[in-house]
């Protein structure tokens, strides 16, 4: 009788214990170490890194295509784990508001025109000096050297990091008044310009007046006659159809239009070393792709704009010299604001 009672009592204890263990195993999926398994699907979602990139030019420009190429390569190099959402044409932010948006963390990457921020980062004023670079190869040699490091460090005081520079190319002049070949041809012209006191000053030295305005307002300003001239790269002139409201294009190669690719430094430091390496590699490959596109698209744009009836003029050596002499005083004005290495560079490149 006693044995039966003990057996019965054991059964009452065993049943709840067995049920409890079963429920824990079935619902909690206990592993030998006592930890709950994680949902693999949820882990996959957590592993995906999504970044938003904003820029203000058209998708069919070198920068627009480079941004798409960057997004594609980042996905490929990460096995689909890194997703870059690209917003072109100022869809998220204008070229005036995008830097502050990046500082606030409202966007992850931007590629603004350096010229819009030369009053904030005075080192970048060197990039706006007319005729300071002979060509894109010369420019790349400078940006990839010690002077390039100084230029990249400028935004760090705002908590931003320059990853590298992308290019749009060298700038040309368009107008609907007359061909611009000599400094006196600038007199009476009204230029839309970027937010750069350096650009304002060299156009003033050439005899023109200027109106600062965001990039996406350039076409309406030209169309309505509020300005009659502008400077830009061939691909921007073509893709934004500026040439349709202008009569003359001067191939001057007088200035550089470049795009530092910027990130918020705090955001960048939160990324893993592997993710940073993937993004840098994708950006570098996109930059090389962009340079190839510039040469290809500029030739096509020039041909199609000429076919539309736009009058195209190329500066002669003597005309270029006249422009250089007219803007030479600006080199002295900029040099005194630069740290010693950049000052020496500006002084060495001053037109003689």
Predicted segments, located by residue:
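Short, solvent-exposed loop/beta-turn-alpha elements that line the ligand-binding surface or hinge
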Residues: 134-157
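N-terminal secretory/targeting leader peptides
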Residues: 2-133, 162-352
């Amino acid at each position: 009788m006693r044995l039966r009672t003990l057996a019965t009592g054991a059964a009452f204890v065993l049943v709840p214990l067995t049920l409890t263990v079963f429920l824990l195993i079935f619902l909690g999926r206990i592993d030998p170490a006592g930890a709950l398994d994680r949902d693999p699907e949820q882990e996959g979602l957590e592993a995906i890194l999504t970044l938003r990139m904003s820029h203000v030019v058209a998708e069919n420009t070198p920068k627009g295509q480079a941004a798409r190429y960057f997004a594609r390569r980042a996905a490929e190099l990460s096995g689909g784990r890194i997703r870059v959402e690209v917003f072109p044409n100022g869809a998220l932010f204008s070229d005036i508001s995008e830097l502050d948006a990046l500082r606030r963390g409202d966007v992850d990457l931007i590629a603004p025109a350096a010229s819009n921020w030369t009053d904030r980062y005075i080192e970048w004023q060197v990039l706006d000096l007319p005729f300071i670079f002979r060509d894109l190869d010369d420019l790349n040699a400078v940006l990839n050297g010690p002077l390039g490091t100084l230029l990249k460090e400028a935004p760090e005081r705002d908590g931003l990091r320059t990853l590298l520079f992308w290019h749009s190319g060298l700038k040309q002049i368009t107008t609907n008044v007359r061909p611009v070949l000599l400094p006196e041809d600038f007199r009476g012209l009204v230029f839309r310009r970027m937010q750069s006191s350096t650009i304002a000053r060299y156009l003033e030295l050439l005899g023109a007046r200027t109106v600062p305005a965001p990039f996406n307002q350039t076409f309406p300003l030209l169309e309505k006659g509020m300005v009659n001239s502008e400077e830009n790269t061939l691909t921007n002139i073509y893709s934004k159809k500026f040439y349709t409201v202008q009569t003359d294009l001067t191939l001057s190669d007088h200035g550089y239009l470049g795009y530092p690719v910027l990130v918020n430094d705090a955001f960048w430091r939160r990324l893993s070393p592997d993710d940073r390496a993937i993004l840098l590699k994708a950006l570098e490959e996109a930059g090389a792709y962009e340079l190839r596109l510039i040469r290809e698209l500029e030739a096509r744009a020039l041909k199609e704009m000429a076919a539309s009836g736009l009058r195209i003029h190329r500066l002669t050596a003597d005309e270029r010299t006249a422009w250089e002499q007219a803007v030479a005083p600006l080199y002295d004005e900029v040099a005194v604001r630069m740290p010693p290495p950049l000052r020496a560079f500006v002084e060495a490149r001053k037109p003689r």
